[in-house]
């Protein structure tokens, strides 16, 4: 398992990326994270909903209730245009961080 404190600072990026692909509800996002990481990282429900609240407050995502015919009245999240710009900034920031870390970690495998 990956230490959650390493990933924690990048949860906004991960969640925004998943919502960029398509509108999603909370459980779907947590399952997608687990699946894509082969269960090496699992997000706790409380953490996930805290991120949703923070992102909604920043107006980078918005919530709406899905149609009952889609399997119940689930709360879905979609990315806003502000969210797309924010995600773009986060991607650039990650590239810079990765470059710095790589400078110190190269050749240590």
From Swiss-Prot:
Stored Gene3D superfamilies? Winged helix-like DNA-binding domain superfamily/Winged helix DNA-binding domain
One Pfam family matching this protein: PadR
Query: What InterPro entries does the record point to?
Result: Metal_resp_DNA-bind_regulator, Tscrpt_reg_PadR_N, WH-like_DNA-bd_sf, WH_DNA-bd_sf
Superkingdom is Bacteria
Instruction: Spell out where the chain crosses the membrane.
Output: none
Q: State the PANTHER family in the record.
A: PADR-FAMILY TRANSCRIPTIONAL REGULATOR, TRANSCRIPTIONAL REGULATOR RV3488
- Mind telling me what this protein is named? Uncharacterized protein X
The primary gene name is: X
